[in-house]
Amino acid sequence: MAGNKDSSWDDIKNEGIDLEKIPIEEVLTQLRCTREGLTSDEGQTRLEIFGPNKLEEKKENKVLKFLGFMWNPLSWVMELAAIMAIALANGGGRPPDWQDFVGITVLLIINSTISFIEENNAGNAAAALMAGLAPKTKVLRDGKWSEQEAAILVPGDIISIKLGDIVPADGRLLDGDPLKIDQSALTGESLPVTKHPGQEVYSGSTCKQGELEAVVIATGVHTFFGKAAHLVDSTNQEGHFQKVLTAIGNFCICSIAIGMLIEIVVMYPIQKRAYRDGIDNLLVLLIGGIPIAMPTVLSVTMAIGSHRLSQQGAITKRMTAIEEMAGMDVLCSDKTGTLTLNKLTVDKSMVEVFVKDLDKDQLLVNAARASRVENQDAIDACIVGMLGDPREAREGITEVHFFPFNPVDKRTAITYIDANGNWHRVSKGAPEQIIELCNLREDASKRAHDIIDKFADRGLRSLAVGRQTVSEKDKNSPGEPWQFLGLLPLFDPPRHDSAETIRRALDLGVNVKMITGDQLAIGKETGRRLGMGTNMYPSSALLGQDKDESIASLPVDELIEKADGFAGVFPEHKYEIVKRLQEMKHICGMTGDGVNDAPALKRADIGIAVADATDAARSASDIVLTEPGLSVIVSAVLTSRAIFQRMKNYTIYAVSITIRIVMGFMLLALIWKFDFSPFMVLIVAILNDGTIMTISKDRVKPSPLPDSWKLKEIFATGVVLGTYLAVMTVVFFWAAESTDFFSAKFGVRSISGNPHELTAAVYLQVSIVSQALIFVTRSRSWSYVERPGFWLISAFFMAQLIATLIAVYANWNFARIRGIGWGWAGVIWLYSIVFYIPLDILKFIIRYSLSGRAWDNVIENKTAFTSKKDYGKGEREAQWAQAQRTLHGLQPAQTSDMFNDKSTYRELSEIADQAKRRAEVARLRERHTLKGHVESVVKQKGLDIEAIQQHYTL
């Protein structure tokens, strides 16, 4: 018998039985299960036979991953230098340059080791957190429904599939209404397909409409998804970040190539230099100029940053989303659950009944009948929770059919049989849908809309209830005319931190737009409470309709840019809003939690799935939040900007050092025919890399405005600073070699005509200023004002202590260096400090010439973080005073032509500034109302407003 069992399971595993085609009852027979599901013991037994319901993960070869860090264009240049050191540097009576070969190899290994360790650690931490977000599913085990990880599913399990779920395994649908299934990830079909009971649904597809049970027929690698995994495999594209990395790398390589070409042309045909001396000079440019640590520093910085984001409750599914979040200047936020608590309550005292023989309690019972008693959403839980006993929702009736909520119909409905055997249908949902369903007369419709507006003015949502008799006693029959029963006021209070979080976002130059499916009046009330402003429009305005007179002349694009939010929004509207903002060169973020948000999440530059989002929303997003509310997003923006700032700081530094090494040593080699030792420039590179690795954990001040890769700024800053440092070295060499300036002024012995001691002096001077440059590029203001992180400053002083000791004491003939003593070391340190000071001024001049905004940092020291508690107080008071004067007609409102030019962040930040101004005006208006005065007194006295509102209505 056991043998037959095993044979049967083998047939199922090997697809010997076509479970997709045979009748559903035969499927249950073959799988030895019933519609009541499996027991836990049977599930465990089958799990051992079929394995977990997940795809086999590709095992990563650690050795190949390690070697992969040595396989990039910058590493190839260093590897070319290593080959040159032993293959070409072999002449002039000297052996191959083995010390340089070994040094280059050690440098490559150090970079790869650090990258491997840090990225591995960050990856493991992120994987552990992602495991907590593993797909879940509703499964029927031991006769009870429970939410379990999808990995435990086995053939024969009964699962529930509802709107927003990603189908966890291949299955056959059981009895019920058809589902709408999106199979685009598997088959490429652009439109959802209708799946009827008995048909198969595939793992990885998304439920777009309906709710139904299914029996699992295949799991893991045996599913359609598993067999066609190559169709949906992640390509791990690096996108814009990789393009930037390539552009900077190419710039550095081209700079080195030009320098080498000039050296070859001048040294050999013109100066007739010895072959080996020329090779050594070329090696100096190759070894010192190539930013070998750049891929390591940037990837490690991003990996560590991703780990930090995950600790803050934002898990990055796509690493490059970090740089996009740093540049985000518009955030389109869902209202319900993100800006509000998504914990609805009904104000029973304000319930409006439209039928004479019905009271408020009976209206609530009818609404509860049109609600789920299991697997409830927020509205269902709110309505059923208003009953004394939740069982009243089904007491005395027999449920025939339940029509679940979907974003298109915006209502639920139940068909039931009462105690007398009569059939009825009750529906609850969006008022407009129910009003249209009931075909209300004009007077009744006007009364309903007046009540809805009254609710909306108080920040309450409206829920309508309708009822009809089904005389045909058939769930598919249209029934008698619908009767409008009444309206229920629902209130979803804002999160306690939403208003402050939105103000923080606006201060950071991120314009928050509310995108809600609720009515316009509710959106405006919520926006006013949250300080977002009330410049909101209905979704019809997106089509050029129903616009205010004040904005009638504005094109739709400008309207979207100027609005604080949109109400009555459908999924296609969200997608259109994001698309239009992107076309206007905005970096757009979008939050969402439902399946209807998935298209907009995928379209947005940064799709953010909020806490408790559906599987479909998580799948479409770039960042998954593990904590509710907007505050985690603002924290993630600041962290992303800090991460991005570290990466940008390093790229400017890398370009500067390349120019500095290439130009400086090329001039020394061609003007004075000075042959610097390749080994010593290798020591400079190793010490530099050791210090620079700590930049991934450096303390930085995030940009006060959205930031992005500005290659023009990076290259311009790098070229100017690098040229200055090169000239600084050339001047130092000239003074030490051709004059007695240092001897006369500081009493040190002359090293003129002593190439080995000159090598030591140049080595120390290059080492000090090359590393000190990072303090200039890492700071937005004066470098000596912004304190670096402990590890960076410690690494700098440790590296320079080693460099100084080498310059003072080293006597290495193979490296052509002889110690110069502490006197010269002190002179070089003083020279370096004096010529370091102009670097900040050069930085400001470059930024000012490129953007005109660098002096803001010099004069105002404007940063995202500050220790001053009253930062921006004067500016806020001025804005408040201006808002008051504008409100009372004492001065005309300021206008801005911000829509004409989007080329700089000054214009982009004006959007956020205008939103702040509108929010201040809205709050000012509120304080001139009785309600506003009461709330102000309550706040000043520290009273509990919620407790007061339970007994009094303002």
From Swiss-Prot:
Major localization listed first in the record, in broad terms: membrane
Ranges facing Cytoplasmic side: 1-66, 120-248, 297-648, 699-714, 778-789, 840-954
InterPro entries membership: ATPase_P-typ_cation-transptr_N, ATPase_P-typ_cyto_dom_N, ATPase_P-typ_P_site, ATPase_P-typ_TM_dom_sf, ATPase_P-typ_transduc_dom_A_sf, HAD-like_sf, HAD_sf, P-type_ATPase_IIIA
Modified positions (Phosphothreonine) in chain numbering: 886, 953
Domain of life per record: Eukaryota
Subcellular location: Membrane
Root EC class: translocase
Positions of the catalytic residues: 334 (4-aspartylphosphate intermediate)
Protein name, as recorded: ATPase 9, plasma membrane-type
Organism: Arabidopsis thaliana (Mouse-ear cress)
